[in-house]
Amino acid sequence: MSADEEILAHYGLTSLSQDYWTEKPDFAIANASVDVQSPTTGVHHERNRSEDILRTGGATSETTKDASAAGPVTPSFAMKRSQTSVQPSMSSQIAIGGMRNPMATRKIAGTYRDAPDNSMQQTSTGVHRSSSWLTTDGTHQLLSLMETNFNKFIAAKETIDNVYAQIISTLSHAGPAKTMDMCEESISGALQQLQLFNTESTNEVDISYGELLVMRECEALFTYPEKFRLYHKQEKYSLLMQEIENAKKLYEKDRERLAKVNPKLVYLVDHAWEIIQATIDGICASIWNQILQSQGDFAFVVRTLCDLLKLKPNPISGRDPVLYATVSQQKYLYNLMKERFSYFEKIIKSRQEDFSKLSCTRASPMLVWRAVARGCNLDYTLRGRPEVFAGMQLIEWANACVLKIVREIKEVELYAKEFISGIQQASYPEAAKHYGRDPKQMGVVVEKLNSQCLEMVYSFVGERGERLEMDGAFVLIQLHYFQRVADLLPKRIRTVFSMAATRCIVDTWMLQHAPQSKSANIEEMFIVDANENQVLEPELMVVDVLRELNKLYIPPHREEIVREIHHAFYKVLYANARFPSMSVSMANWESDVWSLASSTLIDFVQHRNQHDMKKLASKMTTSLPVFSTSITRSDVLHFVTRLLNLRSRLVPYQKFLLQTFPLNEVSPSLDPRISKSLRNLQDLYKLLAIRDTSFSNTTPSSISKLSIQPPTFQLFSTLETIYLELKDSMPPNEAADWMIATTSCMLAQFALHSPYAFFHDIPSISHFLNKCLPPTILDLLQQIQRKAEASSISPTTETATKTRLKFQFIEMIFS
């Protein structure tokens, strides 16, 4: 076997190439097959083998007497690195319990310190001289290999020695914290460099490795902060607390042990514990920031707060963390309220503005009323209409805005009650069990949340429900959707919403069914809905509105709102019970006609002045009002029927109003209003009866010997038709009153347009219409008859034809 192969076999190497070894990183060298089972057998064996190799080359190394006495010859580069690595040494300050041979350690350290400069120069000279005696390339390669490994060992050892020397020299001046801050990075790098040594046998190395042992013992404490941060990141707070307990036990154990060995080393352990405490404080601060920044998840806040107090019972310097966390949630919820309410205010305002620019067909009030009365689904009945969209938008506001906030507040309120009762503090450390137990402070936070929510709702809906207006939707539609929204809301918020919604309904009710312009024009009273060809009579829906309002605005009622409801009730009925009067009074017109009949007409008939009679009749007719729209007697009778029904229902309506919305005030009376409206309608009916009848004019030559003239018979036929209309449309008393008034007016019209027939048939008319005319008109007819007789106008005296006339009105029976 050659010399190279013997070297390779002895050291377990595969190659003597220097490039192979020097290009490898430190961890590769650490894992090499060189015998490094212990620092003693590794380092000192390297030194002895280097001397053997030198001697096998046949060279005689020149060494000093002091150096040869201290031990084997050390190469000059090793001595030089050793001298720099042991200033100052720990041999005079530290005695490590694990060191078995302190005398040998001091001897080795003394050798490094006492080696003179001339011996180092001689050794260096011997090494260079022996290099020329080497006979093989393997020898050069092995020396280079040994120098490389030994240089790495010396570099790592030198770092540890220098760092620890700096620690020892500055502990008493700068303190452990500042010193360790300066040296931790260097220590970490040195520990990585020394991974090639077996840590189990470190205590057998010289005094510099005693220093390393101390640092490794402290390293366990310095690794805890990283574990703490990892557990905090993973939110494994139970493991974190367990590791904190382990760190505390290790700290107490190491501190007690090192205090016995060397009290100065306690500074190092104390500093490690200070770093641990600072890490814990940082983690607690981070957890507290998470609690303050959490938004809406109060369950997370409570759970995290429990973990925080277990780590640090006093996280915010004596103040109540439970109270502060609750206040933080209160601030978040308030911001959430402002954000959500502002969003819905914006979209509702946009919808109202857009709708005002559009012309949409409104839902028929009659259709809605029938749907409500029959319990139909308005969403389906009104599908596709803007009223449904507006109503569903309010329902979305209740669900996505109000109810979401209320649920958050309820959660805070529930946890606040549990904190006040001490349920949540059961798992808290003893020093933190008093947190959150003040009912006044915790109650103030919850009450403030509720009051803020109420203020937001009040501001949103408006004092009179301005935000709730559904683009002029029919009052029953608004009531339907307002009721659906109110059913979703909790009690206190429902009260605020209901008051505003009730005022909005009251305003809409009066606006739609009691407009100020409704009483200005008679023709407007008879406008018919072109779509449905029906008119919803407001008095029909009074009970429906009151019933729905009673569901919407539940007790306790505020007096001013109840007064507004009463005001709207009477205003709607008052407006619909009012019928305007005409510009000309039919009573005055009739009186003028009878005055003419008793004077001027007699003269005209006596002198047969037909031209003046026609002129007078035209003048009296044109003095009556003319309507641009077609109004019939049946329309008037329908309106009369409504008023009569309203008068008959008024007392039940008033009782229902007082039952649903009690008010200790005297109810106004509508009887005078209804009576006046009926008189105005009666005048209109008389006017229409005159307009609808055209009497044929007669001349003296056309007067026949018959007892009843044709125009007189036409008058009786018209009165028969009117009698039947009134009998079917009114109660007996009202029908009789209207029949008498209409007969008198028709007779005046008859006298104006057919004076010859009138004067000829006065006796028959007085006899036949005895029950159909008021006493004043009967007396007036007798006076006219006497004047006619005095003027040589001979009226007929035939009355036997009464039995042959089959007119029902003559008897005036309406029952």
Swiss-Prot record:
Signal peptide positions on this chain: none
What does the entry list under GO cellular component?
cell division site; cell tip; exocyst
Q: Which family is this protein grouped under?
A: Belongs to the SEC5 family.
Subcellular location, principal: cytoplasm
Q: What Pfam families does its record include?
A: Sec5
Give the source's domain of life in one word: Eukaryota
What gene makes this protein?
sec5
Query: Briefly, what is this protein's role?
Result: Component of the exocyst complex involved in the docking of exocytic vesicles with fusion sites on the plasma membrane.
Protein name (database record): Exocyst complex component sec5
Quaternary context: Component of the exocyst complex.
Residues of the region (Disordered) are 37-74
Cellular compartments annotated: Cytoplasm
Q: Biological process GO terms, please?
A: exocytosis; Golgi to plasma membrane transport; protein transport; vesicle tethering involved in exocytosis
Could you tell me where the Basic and acidic residues compositional bias lies?
43-54
- PANTHER family the record matches: EXOCYST COMPLEX COMPONENT 2, EXOCYST COMPLEX COMPONENT SEC5
Kindly give the InterPro entries that the UniProt entry links to this protein.
Answer: EXOC2/Sec5, EXOC2/Sec5_N_dom
